Amino acid sequence: MPRMLAASAAIIATTLAPLSAQAAGCEMTLHGINLSGAEFGQPGDPYGQGYIYPSESTIKAFADDGFNAVRLPFLWERLQPTLNGTLDATELSRIKDTVETLRDNGMVVILDVHNYARYHGEMIGTPNVPVAAFADFWKRLSAVFANDDDVIFGLMNEPHDISAPAWLAAANAAIDAIRTIGAGNLVLVPGTAWTGAHSWSQTFYGPSNASVMAQVVDSSNNFAYEVHQYTDDDFSGKNADCSKIDDAVSALNDFTSWLNANDVQGFLGEFGTTEQIQCLRGLKQMVDVVQQNPRAWLGWAYWAGGDWWPKDSPMIIHSNPRDGGTQQLRTLQPVLGSNTTRASCNTKS
């Protein structure tokens, strides 16, 4: 490509967010896309049938569109088939090859363990999946990419049905394991309750993320909080409506205030809408919150793209514009590729 698309109403141009405050030597605002596929299926499914990593052509298409980051979901069980065991060499090679392709295209990668705080369906912190096993996984994975400025560690996708104190203990153990082996990479820390911005201050799991997650401990002080936010009726992103646009934008503004009050930074790791006009308006408003608050936000990653999404998937931006998602891309286009320095993050330490 690239796809030169006419811009919709202008989105505020990005101001450089100091990613260097979180990832040494790298200053840019992350304008990302979730490239889905490696988290699909069940752990035992054959590669290429049950799951897939993004192809080189897909990665190049999104890089040419101006995206400078990819959130890369994958399954813990595939990479570490036995708790506390070695990483599977074949699966690790697939991840490393994908990272290299992203690097070749000038993109930062967020390694996203897409497991909802579970391993084979059992919660982290239970007898069969102790916190130490989660820390062990991150010790092993972080050693592979230690101090690569263009590799960010996303601790876990959307923990849920676990209390904030229990999740905090697991997150702190993983961060400690990462730092103990000498990896200084930026770490993205979610909360519980699906890490929704809308649920950040809610107490239906017990103490809120807002009251608990400020107690993250990182000896390198190189982390940011990851939240997700959708605009449909239940904030899940699974429905085609966008009836909660105002609530979603308000939630992001409230989370921005929490970030500023605690002198920390955030990352909007998932958000997206359908191509209905009112939904696109909400999409722009959510991007505006991040773009207008560069001291609080490192950036965002749209959900989603990837090789295996059906053409009729309502929120998906396809690498081939004929397959759908062009209206969402038009809405994001004004900030893609603007005021970023991808090359500064595209080096291995």
Curated annotation (Swiss-Prot):
The gene that this protein is the product of is cel5A
User: What activity regulation does UniProt give?
Assistant: Is salt tolerant and retains more than 50% residual activity up to 15% NaCl.
EC code(s) of this entry:
3.2.1.4
Q: Which InterPro entries does the UniProt entry name for this protein?
A: Glyco_hydro_5, Glyco_hydro_5_CS, Glycoside_hydrolase_SF
pH dependence, per the record?
Optimum pH is 4.5 with CMC as substrate.
Catalysed reaction(s)? Endohydrolysis of (1->4)-beta-D-glucosidic linkages in cellulose, lichenin and cereal beta-D-glucans
Q: How does activity depend on temperature?
A: Optimum temperature is 50 degrees Celsius with CMC as substrate. Retains 50% of its activity at temperatures ranging from 30 to 60 degrees Celsius.
Family (UniProt): Belongs to the glycosyl hydrolase 5 (cellulase A) family.
What's one GO MF term for it? hydrolase activity, hydrolyzing O-glycosyl compounds
What does the record give as the function of this protein?
Answer: Shows highest activity on carboxymethyl cellulose (CMC). Shows weak activity on xylan, and no activity against avicel, laminarin and chitin.
* Classification via Gene3D superfamilies: Glycosidases
Signal peptide stretch: 1-23
Output this protein's name: Endoglucanase
EC class:
hydrolase
Q: Active-site positions, per UniProt?
A: 158 (proton donor), 270 (nucleophile)
Any GO BP annotation: cellulose catabolic process
Q: What keywords does the record list, in alphabetical order?
A: Carbohydrate metabolism, Cellulose degradation, Glycosidase, Hydrolase, Polysaccharide degradation, Signal
What PANTHER family does the record tag this protein with?
Answer: ENDO-BETA-1,4-GLUCANASE A, GLYCOSIDE HYDROLASE FAMILY 5 DOMAIN-CONTAINING PROTEIN
